């Protein structure tokens, strides 16, 4: 059985001048991008936004954090992802207008926690920023079972900043 590396003092990533990975979804509040930009400005780092498309699977992961992906259903051609990518880029460009921060958008695939972890490892991110999942009447168990922030905090060593989207 493979032993999973645990959080430890020697694994703390320096924050100064290091990138942040930011999980985004289409139509998400600009609070997530703006909060990440504020932290990036404070630390002198850049931002790598990542959207993990759950309708696609990873074919190959590359050292720079990008992935080659394909539709979950191989018999169905899906070029809608290109439009989602363009929409996300536009959403982020509008949200970050006038902010002096360098950023890139990566279109990922599969489970968000795994995709963001791969991206963070690849770019040497100091932390991962995600928006809080909004509870819409679900049971507490369901809320925590699906929380990307919680999965990230439990399955990788970087700090996770969860941005509240409503209170």
Tell me what each language-model feature is.
Residues 69-87, 138:
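A short acidic, glycine-rich active-site loop
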Residues 48-50, 104-108, 161-163:
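General small-molecule cofactor/ligand-binding pocket signal
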Residues 11-73, 155:
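Small/aliphatic-rich secondary-structure junction motif
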Residues 127-154:
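Glycine-rich, Arg-bearing micro-motifs that act as flexible, cationic patches
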Residues 153-167:
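Short, flexible loop segments at boundaries between secondary-structure elements
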Residues 1-16, 94-128, 167:
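Structural beta-alpha unit
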Residues 64-68, 122-124, 147:
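Short, hinge-like loop/turn segments at secondary-structure boundaries
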Residues 37, 90, 150:
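Active-site phosphate/pyrophosphate- and oxyanion-stabilizing loops and adjacent acidic/basic residues
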